[in-house]
Amino acid sequence: MTTRIDTKFAELKAEGRPALVTYFMGGDPDLETALKVMKALPKAGADVIELGMPFSDPMADGPAIQAAGLRALNAGQTLAKTLYMAAEFRKEDDTTPIVMMGYYNPIYVYGVERFLTDAKASGVDGLIVVDLPSEMDAELCIPAMKAGINFIRLTTPTTDDKRLPKVLHNSSGFVYYVSMNGITGAAIADTAKVGEAVRHIKKSTDLPICVGFGVKTPEQAAAIATHADSVVVGTAIVNAIAGELDEKGKVKGDPVAAATRLVHALAESVRATRLEAAQ
């Protein structure tokens, strides 16, 4: 099974450059605006899109992404509407991978079999479910793989050599290395330590290693890109969108332009880093 994720990373490896993975919250600040943001991301330089699934109790998310999820839920966003966003995006873009990221509860309530059927039909390529450990692979991971959807695991600085094989087992698409302990949006880890961690993980898997949590600026993204197959940026994009909203979370400026300006700058830095290193 070759997915869009596999194809994208193979293309980028051939080009000798890392990927830029961009996260935003589905439905933030409203469905229409969020869909416009999603459609604009690839043109701005995003190689992979992480589409957040809003949830009322996001334990791993920092204040910015928690607020984005709350805005989306208050605007009426549901899992069905998040899948609708993927389907609408696919009408215009059949190559950029979509990874849905969030928590298991909304999927469980929706119904696992129904969710996987609808996700596949909507053009979703991968899942990151942060609160579903490998011991629960039978719940969603294995059914997702059978449905042709990659299941992407998180590893952290505390994932030891005994735990790592369990995390990597049944993983596909890429491995998401959380660069520090804590919630999204916290301070970035020392890039040298990130490089050591990436090299260590690569001894156990051929999957691309993507590094995220704490990457906010083009300079930070470039530093991480020297070590990893991909850089993941989320909180900074969510903050760019939030900066164009009023105190009630309604659009007052241009969230699409704000998000795409940032993504363009991130993409240029990430791409230039590897090109400079190759010279």
UniProtKB/Swiss-Prot annotation:
It holds the Pfam family Trp_syntA. Pathway: Amino-acid biosynthesis; L-tryptophan biosynthesis; L-tryptophan from chorismate: step 5/5. The keyword Amino-acid biosynthesis applies. It comes from the Bacteria. Signal peptide: none annotated. It catalyses: (1S,2R)-1-C-(indol-3-yl)glycerol 3-phosphate + L-serine = D-glyceraldehyde 3-phosphate + L-tryptophan + H2O. InterPro entries: Aldolase_TIM (IPR013785), RibuloseP-bd_barrel (IPR011060), Trp_synthase_alpha_AS (IPR018204), Trp_synthase_suA (IPR002028). It is an enzyme of class 4 (lyase). GO terms for cellular component: cytosol. One of its GO terms (molecular function) is tryptophan synthase activity. The active site is at E50 (proton acceptor), D61 (proton acceptor). Its EC number is 4.2.1.20. The keyword Transmembrane does not apply. Keywords: Amino-acid biosynthesis, Aromatic amino acid biosynthesis, Lyase, Tryptophan biosynthesis. Belongs to the TrpA family. Tetramer of two alpha and two beta chains. The alpha subunit is responsible for the aldol cleavage of indoleglycerol phosphate to indole and glyceraldehyde 3-phosphate. This is Tryptophan synthase alpha chain.
